[in-house]
Amino acid sequence: MEALRQRIEAAFEARTDITPSTVDERVRSDVQHVINMLDKGELRVAEKIDGLWHVHQWLKKAVLLSFRIFDNAVIDGAETKYFDKVPLKFAEYDEARFKAEAIRVVPSATVRKGSFIGKNTVLMPSYVNLGAYVDEGTMVDTWATVGSCAQIGKNVHLSGGVGIGGVLEPLQAGPTIIEDNCFIGARSEIVEGVVVEEGSVISMGVYIGQSTRIYDRETGEVHYGRVPAGSVVVSGNLPSACGKYSLYAAIIVKKVDAKTRSKVGINELLRIVD
């Protein structure tokens, strides 16, 4: 694996000289191998090790190289044809394979090859970009999008119209991460490498990027780029120092543990008690 990483790194440094017609066959093979392993979930752009998320930048480089290496090609779809460099993940699936992997894909859902979809997932008409990792038992609801290299945990619910930001460039940027057992409410956007930690509930219409203030009303703490585990978050505002205006913020209204979540429905958790 180290040799593969080094070859990808070297090819990326020389990427300006690479085209579909000039690429070395070893480089083409290496990049395709990485895409295939991402597709199977054998590799992932980010993984949690000893409680901390680690980003494998060389895998992002392989994904970027794929755009320089592969030509556009006609892709058959249910209602139309497409013309793109990246094939569709399920193009060669048959009934037996769908059943074996326990994946339900509703018509017009689009998943690009190089993204991993875990068992017992449901994909409503939605979009999953390459490099993404969607773990077991997750629901990606209608018009939700999972961006490039985003990491979605087990038993997550991405509600209708949710946007999970992608990241390929700049290379140093970490992917957006939604940890296990989270609920992301309709039309919310989580972007720019924000991490939503395990068991959190994000209400409808909440927008969180790296510069968004995430205010804990119980403690007065302000977080950036991270929603602490077990948070229930709604959209709100915080006053300016001068008191003349207010600016948008995400507000942590309460914390819940797994035991509470198992007994109380999502709608109950989102009811604010003043």
Swiss-Prot record:
Gene Ontology terms: biological process: diaminopimelate biosynthetic process; lysine biosynthetic process; lysine biosynthetic process via diaminopimelate
Reaction(s) catalysed by this chain's protein: (S)-2,3,4,5-tetrahydrodipicolinate + succinyl-CoA + H2O = (S)-2-succinylamino-6-oxoheptanedioate + CoA
Example of a GO cellular component annotation carried by this entry: cytoplasm
Record-annotated membrane-spanning stretches: none
SUPFAM superfamilies for this protein: Trimeric LpxA-like enzymes (SSF51161)
Residues that hold substrate according to the record: 104, 141
Domain of life: Bacteria
InterPro entries referenced in this protein's UniProt entry, alphabetically: DapD_Trfase_Hexpep_rpt_fam, Hexapep, Hexapep_transf_CS, THP_succinylTrfase_dom1, THP_succinylTrfase_N_sf, Trimer_LpxA-like_sf
Alphabetical list of CDD domains matching this protein: LbH_THP_succinylT (cd03350)
Swiss-Prot/TrEMBL keywords: Acyltransferase, Amino-acid biosynthesis, Cytoplasm, Diaminopimelate biosynthesis, Lysine biosynthesis, Repeat, Transferase
Pathway the protein contributes to: Amino-acid biosynthesis; L-lysine biosynthesis via DAP pathway; LL-2,6-diaminopimelate from (S)-tetrahydrodipicolinate (succinylase route): step 1/3
A family per Pfam: THDPS_N_2
GO MF annotation terms: 2,3,4,5-tetrahydropyridine-2,6-dicarboxylate N-succinyltransferase activity; nucleotidyltransferase activity
Cell compartments where the protein resides: Cytoplasm
Main location: cytoplasm
EC number: 2.3.1.117
Family that this chain belongs to: Belongs to the transferase hexapeptide repeat family.
PANTHER family documented for this protein: 2,3,4,5-TETRAHYDROPYRIDINE-2,6-DICARBOXYLATE N-SUCCINYLTRANSFERASE (PTHR19136:SF52), MOLYBDENUM COFACTOR GUANYLYLTRANSFERASE (PTHR19136)
Subunit structure: Homotrimer.
NCBIfam families in the record: dapD, PRK11830.1
Protein name: 2,3,4,5-tetrahydropyridine-2,6-dicarboxylate N-succinyltransferase
Organism: Shewanella oneidensis (strain ATCC 700550 / JCM 31522 / CIP 106686 / LMG 19005 / NCIMB 14063 / MR-1)
Gene: dapD
